[in-house]
Amino acid sequence: MSATSSHDLGRTIVPNTRMVNQNWWITTLLINSHKYCPPLTRDIECDVLIVGGGFSGISAAAEFLRKGLRVVLIEKNIVGGSSSGRSAGFLTPDSELELHQLVRRYGTAAAAEIWEAPCRGIERIVSTLKKYDIQCGLLQQDSLFLGLGSGGTEAVESERECRESVGFTDQRTYDASQLQQILGAQGYTAGIRYGGTYGVNPLQCLQGLKDLLIDNGMQVFESTEMDRIDDHTVYTHAGTVTAQNIIIAVDKLPDAISPLADETFHAQTFLSVTEPLTDRELRILFPSGEQMQCWDSKLVYSYFRLTGDNRLLLGGGTPVTTFLKDAYNNPGVIRRVIKDFRSHFPQLDDLSFIQFWPGQIDVTRDLLPVIARPPGLEHVRFILGCVGIPWATFCGSFAARNVLGEADDDYRKYFNYFSNERHFVLPSGLGKVIGKPLLFSLANSWAKFYQVDTLRAPAEAQKEF
């Protein structure tokens, strides 16, 4: 099918250019070489086994550096080859929940504690990338939350009030006319901006961190999937790993591995990328010359930022495909997202989007992560439903520090929010009756807009994770 084009004031507009269905981050792996990690083909033993090479698993592994322990990491794809390496690479504490939603759910003090977790995740990633000079397109980009309509304006105002209530001072709000100074868009009614956030190529980041782990003596086996776990031993297709402690940080956890699979749900989004923008296009997008990572106030929101080589990365979805049980791979969804973007940026109608790819992220019913230690498997910790790179990074570090006995203070602070024993409005078993997509759709909307939580006192007995 050939591209269709039209002309508007001398500009050629190509809204239906055929896009290649391919993860752009995979394409960028051709730029730098990384260590080859063959599959596991023998039986080995270690002190700590980490299953999963996304941001949770890699962050957990990094906690064991220079601890004198034998650490092994296995990944069914390449490190970063699953959800983490298909993401937009936003390093922001915002994910599925805005700060004002956390304040409503938990109160000001608790919301501040929760918000601190992804902020620590960002600090951990950025400091490591800078310390070891890992080349992965790291860019400092302020976050800009964009309101649509009167509801979006109210959300922006609520976010401002909540940021002030928890003590943040770096935020700035914009009305529709003021937004024109920093964003060449139309149709947004308000915005709130804050700093301390970044963009990164997530796949290059994880591959670079993998190389760092290997250089420090860790064993990494790619193309090695966990088939089952029996006490202290994880079985793969061609080998086994027996470990004193095991951290399982995988997405799309199979039911056969653990009933904790019932705690995870999927949200699907789509991403697309353009050719590098010209200087003129960059000035249209960000008139002030300051790059930002942006997202809007829709329930299924659209989001965009620039990459290190000045390509526009644009993502979003639809209410239907977001909650589907199985992956849906069709360019029609991202074309609608692109069409909506062009309605806000008519001067960028001629941008050429060259690649697109879908991705399913793991989430929980209330949109906060779960860290769990199953009864009878006290040496095993699961990390589930971390939406956003900073959240995953913090949770991986947190789980590892619990193994090391170095997280008592953080445990008392965070067990309320991350334990799978916390209160959920709708039970996971309801998914077997009405289906997991419908259950997640209901629970997701409730958590975002209505849920109010009651905090528990720390248990005096054995820790929950």
What is each stretch, according to the model?
Residues M1-V48:
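Extreme N-terminal leader/targeting segments of oxidoreductases
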Residues V48-L73:
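N-terminal Rossmann-like FAD-binding beta1-loop-alpha1 element of flavoenzymes
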Residues R66-R86:
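Glycine-rich FAD pyrophosphate-binding loop
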Residues D94-S177:
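Dinucleotide-binding Rossmann-like beta1-alpha1 core, especially the glycine-rich loop
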Residues E123, K131-L139, M226, T240-R280, ...:
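Active-site substrate-recognition segment that forms the wall
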Residues Q135-F145, S177-G208, G317-V320:
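Helix-loop-beta segment of a Rossmann-like dinucleotide-binding subdomain
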Residues E161-C162, Q186-Q244:
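Helical element adjacent to the flavin cofactor pocket in flavoenzyme catalytic cores
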Residues V320-F440, Y450:
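C-terminal catalytic lobe of FAD-dependent flavoproteins
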